[in-house]
Amino acid sequence: MAPVSIVSRAAMRAAAAPARAVRALTTSTALQGSSSSTFESPFKGESKAAKVPDFGKYMSKAPPSTNMLFSYFMVGTMGAITAAGAKSTIQEFLKNMSASADVLAMAKVEVDLNAIPEGKNVIIKWRGKPVFIRHRTPAEIEEANKVNVATLRDPETDADRVKKPEWLVMLGVCTHLGCVPIGEAGDYGGWFCPCHGSHYDISGRIRKGPAPLNLEIPLYEFPEEGKLVIG
């Protein structure tokens, strides 16, 4: 009887297996049905593709050439405004930097010639530079006029360098490298530059040495007898 019982139980389990499978399928279907949420998604039924906003109504209807002309106009206008502002700024800067009337007045120096004896040199300061004033003797004037201008490095007659023969007025700056020459010295009885050995005659003309030019003549005038104004 034991073998029969074992066979019977096996047959019963085999017969019950389909029923369990049906119950499991039914249970799974029920769970799936009940798992849906009661919350309804606002996107339900919407297409998964994102919609791009249409800004066409905000775009200019003018042709491209018109837009470019407008851009050029704006750039040109801004450039003109900038240039006008820069011009005004530069003009104001230059105005502030220009010398005042007081400064210009100080640029002129007045000299009393009665205080300078004949045959003597006087050195004054004008615009930060030394000015040589020589009260020449008749012999010095004659010597200056005897020089052959054609032999000079920087040809100038004595008459071209003075307004009155007895008064020689010139900047005391060597035309070589800017040193101050020594008066009544050198091989020509005029001025000698100790820096590099330039010799100037009694008219201030270069005669020997490395200097290329004669001593410079500043602006000056004789407003009245016995008075000299430089500048």
From Swiss-Prot:
The chain crosses the membrane at residues 66-95. It is found in: Mitochondrion inner membrane. Residues 25-32 form a propeptide. Its cofactor is [2Fe-2S] cluster. It comes from the Eukaryota. Pfam families: Rieske, UCR_TM. Disruption phenotype: Mutants display reduced growth, are female sterile and lack active complex III. PROSITE patterns: RIESKE. One of its GO terms (cellular component) is mitochondrial inner membrane. It catalyses: a quinol + 2 Fe(III)-[cytochrome c](out) = a quinone + 2 Fe(II)-[cytochrome c](out) + 2 H(+)(out). [2Fe-2S] cluster binds at residues 174, 176, 193, 196. Disulfide bonds join 179-195. Keywords: 2Fe-2S, Disulfide bond, Electron transport, Iron, Iron-sulfur, Membrane, Metal-binding, Mitochondrion, Mitochondrion inner membrane, Respiratory chain, Transit peptide, Translocase, Transmembrane, Transmembrane helix, Transport. Processed by both the mitochondrial processing peptidase (MPP) and the mitochondrial intermediate protease (MIP). Initially, MPP removes 25 amino acids from the newly imported precursor in the mitochondrial matrix. This proteolytic processing is then followed by a second proteolytic cleavage by MIP, which removes an octapeptide to generate mature-sized Rieske protein. Its EC number is 7.1.1.8. The Rieske protein is a high potential 2Fe-2S protein. Component of the ubiquinol-cytochrome c oxidoreductase, a multisubunit transmembrane complex that is part of the mitochondrial electron transport chain which drives oxidative phosphorylation. Component of the ubiquinol-cytochrome c oxidoreductase (cytochrome b-c1 complex, complex III, CIII), a multisubunit enzyme composed of 10 subunits. The complex is composed of 3 respiratory subunits cytochrome b (cob), cytochrome c1 (cyt-1) and Rieske protein (fes-1), 2 core protein subunits pep and ucr-1, and 5 low-molecular weight protein subunits qcr6, qcr7, qcr8, qcr9 and probably NCU16844/qcr10. Belongs to the Rieske iron-sulfur protein family. This is Cytochrome b-c1 complex subunit Rieske, mitochondrial. It comes from Neurospora crassa (strain ATCC 24698 / 74-OR23-1A / CBS 708.71 / DSM 1257 / FGSC 987). The gene is fes-1.
